Amino acid sequence: MRSKSLIDAGRMLACWTALAIDKSEKDPDEKVRKETGDLVELMTPIVKALLTDYGVEITYDMLQVHGGHGYIREYGMEQFSRDVRIAPIWEGTNGIQALDLAGRKMPQHMGRLLRRFFHPALDFIEQNKEDTDMKEFVVPFSKALKGLQKTTLYMAQKGLGNPYEIGAAATDYLRQFGLVAMGYMWLLMLKVAFSKREKDDYYEHKIILARFFFERILPETLSRAITISSGSKTMMSLPDEGFNSNSQFSGVV
């Protein structure tokens, strides 16, 4: 269920961003083109890094499901595992995507790009917070979104005085942001699913998967926020010689 809920949210996120690309290029309204262009700039490193990281994780999990048979050539999983591993390295590696998000996109235009995501998400919460069906999903999403906003503010403040703070937090920040974005995608899908659940079991299955995501995956944003709040001090404290893997232990107690 973890893999399925991530795949569904990831596909929705990719399609949602692709639609924004189309609007940024083709919409007749200049204001819409500008706003969706900002959204595309913000979401590009998230889509590239989040989906390829999860692609590797999911493929490895599915290999694990096969047990020892997953490791041998006849079942094909080992080929999938080797093929998917290159994805996080393409496009400049996912660490670079994280630095692009945290170091460039986050502060760009005084936070204007961030507002293209935060404002619609906040509007959705306001419009659906009293919806009986949606409430169990809107409440945890609202908390996760507030957590992301708090992390963003923390990084903006700390990064001004110490550039290492941005580098230390970048990968965790991208994952936190990506999970919140996936949560938003699930909310958009749920609006459709609840309206059609009586007509087709497919939509009921989507609701179950969404519930799994909100209960078991979205809470991972909390640990990412805690990691970010630990700062860069410890990460930058080990001198170069500390990375020497040659044992210096003498055996004398």
Q: Which role fits each region the language model picked out?
A:
Residues Q108, F124-V253:
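C-terminal amphipathic alpha-helical interaction region
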Residues S3-A14, I21, L51-I58, E91, ...:
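Alpha-helical transition-metal enzyme core signature, strongest for iron centers
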